[in-house]
Amino acid sequence: MEIFDYDNILLLPRKCRVESRAECDASVTLGQRSFRIPVVPANMKTVVNEDICVWMAQNGYFYVMHRFDLDNLQFVRDMQARGVYASISLGVKQPDYDTVDRLVAEGLAPEYITIDIAHGHADTVRKMIAYLKNHLPESFVIAGNVATPEAVIDLENWGADATKVGIGPGKVCITKMKTGFGTGGWQLSALKWCARVATKPIIADGGIREHGDIAKSIRFGATMVMIGSMLAGLEESPGQTVEVDGKLFKEYYGSASDFNKGEYKHVEGKRILEPIKGKLVDTLREMEEDVQSAISYAGGTRLMDIRKVNYVVLGGKNSNEDLMM
C-alpha cells in the first residue's frame, strides 16, 4: 500500500478541451440535490452557525450544522420555514435518540443527517443508523468518521448513504498524539484505500490545506471534502475575533477540545488562531474557480473527469518518488 498525503501528490495534466475554465462544471450531487462545489464546511462551532447555514442553503452549497449547544428541532423548523433544506448532526447517546423521536412526533424530517462521532466504526453507530432508517427513512444519512475499508463496508451495509473518512488529520485535531491512531499524515492514502471498496459517496474530512487538495481528494475517490481551518478564518466565521499585534484572528478549536466540551475530559482537540482572510462568498467563489481550473487541467468538463488523470508521488518522509500511470 502506498503511503502519501496531499503535499506528496501532484496530478498530471491532460489535453485541455475547453476555451475557458468557466465552461467546466464543478457541481456535485449528494442525495437528491446538486451543489455548486464539492466542499462542505466542517460541522464545528467555530466554522458554521445558523446564519452561515441559511446562506449556504440559499446559494446552492452543502452544509452540515454542528450538534453542540443547539436545539436541533428548532433549527429544522427554522430552515424549513425559510424554504431551504435542513442538514443536522447527531451523536449516538440517549439525547440524540430523543431528538429523533421529537422530530418524528412533529413530522419534521431533515433532508440530511450526519452521525458525527470521532470513531465511527462502532456498534453505537450501527444502532443509530438502524434507528434513523426505521424512524426517518427519507433522510439521507452520512456516518463517520472512519479510516479503513472495513469500516466503510460496514457502515454502508448498516445503511449509511455516505461515509465520512478521516480520523485526526485536521489542523486542530490531536488524536494521533493522544491515542496513536488516525489518518494524520496519510489522509489522502486512507481516502484512496477506502474509496476502492466504497459503493456510496465518501466525504473526505480533514487535512485540506490548499484549494488544490480539493481536486486531489476527488481524484482519489471523494465525492465531497469537509474543510475546517480554511473556512474558520473568515469575517463571518462564528469563532471569537481576537487581535494580536494589530492583526485580526478568529478562534478555531476542535470538536473534541476542552474549549468546545467545556470540560477537560477525553480531549482530542486544541485551540488555534486563524488569520482573518476574507469573506465567505469570495472564498467559495475562488474555490469554485480553482476546481474549474483543475477540471480543465484534467482535460475534462465535469468534476469527476478529475478521476481519470495520472499522478506523481513526490519524495518525502512518507513516500518514495514514483510515477503512477
Curated annotation (Swiss-Prot):
Membrane spanning stretches: none
Annotated active site: C173
SMART domains the UniProt entry points to: IMPDH (SM01240)
Pfam families for this protein: IMPDH
Family annotation (InterPro entries): Aldolase_TIM, GMP_reductase, GuaC_type_2, IMP_DH/GMP_Rdtase_CS, IMP_DH_GMPRt
Catalysed reaction equations from the record: IMP + NH4(+) + NADP(+) = GMP + NADPH + 2 H(+)
Keyword Repeat found: no
Keyword line: NADP, Oxidoreductase
Family designation: Belongs to the IMPDH/GMPR family. GuaC type 2 subfamily.
Protein name, as recorded: GMP reductase
Organism taxonomic ancestry: Bacteria, Pseudomonadati, Pseudomonadota, Betaproteobacteria, Burkholderiales
Gene that encodes it: guaC
